[in-house]
Design a protein with these regions (language model features):
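Sensory/regulatory domains in signal-transduction proteins
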Residues: 2-165
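Short hydrophobic short-linear motifs embedded
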Residues: 167-206
């Protein structure tokens, strides 16, 4: 993890979790993470695997140009990336495994032309963390999508669909100290022949 939002949210999640596989949704005190909420979201794990947003931070609403709450999380991503995102969400829930990733956003082309702004890419760090909900383990997921830097179009025009850059499960050493160690666990997404490969196994487990 590189972004302070990711690090702070993970540390808070870890304190709530204690010896459990994941903390409960009701354990979260918004006041304790008020400085993070603009970049945070909560996803419901539904039977249809649409993954509706149950909480969506104000900066994410600004990114997408409207209220994100209730919208399917997968709709925020390019068609080509949705299978990987869905598999990552299920891996987090089924394996109680935190996942960190990178994404990229551009201003929507038509809107950027009308508003006379650039389409310069804005880079994000994605963090996905498992939650329990009223004791159920396959119910909710806590996440953050935090931007690196600023671009002139942000908040003025909506972003196009997010582009997934990378996904990986957090290593044991990284979970202990946020040291950035990556060798203990294989990445979820690998670059081979110019593309990512993500294989989904029964029960939502995923391997590269």
């Amino acid at each position: 993890m590189r972004h302070s939002v990711s690090k702070d949210l993970y540390a808070y999640w870890g304190r709530l979790r204690g010896a459990r596989a994941a903390p409960d949704r009701n354990d979260i005190d918004p006041g304790a993470i008020r400085h993070l909420l603009a970049d945070c979201f909560i996803v419901e794990i539904d039977q249809a695997c649409l993954f509706p947003l149950r909480l969506c931070g104000t900066r994410l609403n600004a990114l997408w140009g409207g209220e994100g709450r209730g919208a399917p999380f997968l709709d925020m991503w390019r068609d080509a990336d949705r299978r990987e995102i869905a598999a990552a969400l299920l891996t987090v829930i089924d394996g109680a495994t935190p996942i960190v990733g990178a994404a990229k956003a551009h201003a929507r082309a038509a809107d950027s032309e009308q508003a006379d702004v650039s389409r310069r890419a804005l880079d994000f760090e994605l963090l996905l963390l498992p939650l329990r909900h009223f004791g159920k383990t396959r119910s909710r997921l806590l996440g953050s999508l935090a931007p690196f830097g600023e671009v002139d179009w942000f908040g003025r025009v909506p972003a196009a669909k997010l582009e997934l850059v990378s996904l990986r499960m957090m290593s044991v050493s990284e979970r202990r100290g946020f040291t950035g160690a990556r060798a203990a666990r294989p990445p979820l997404a690998s670059q081979e022949s110019g593309g990512r490969h993500f294989i989904v196994y029964e029960g939502g487990k995923a391997r590269a």
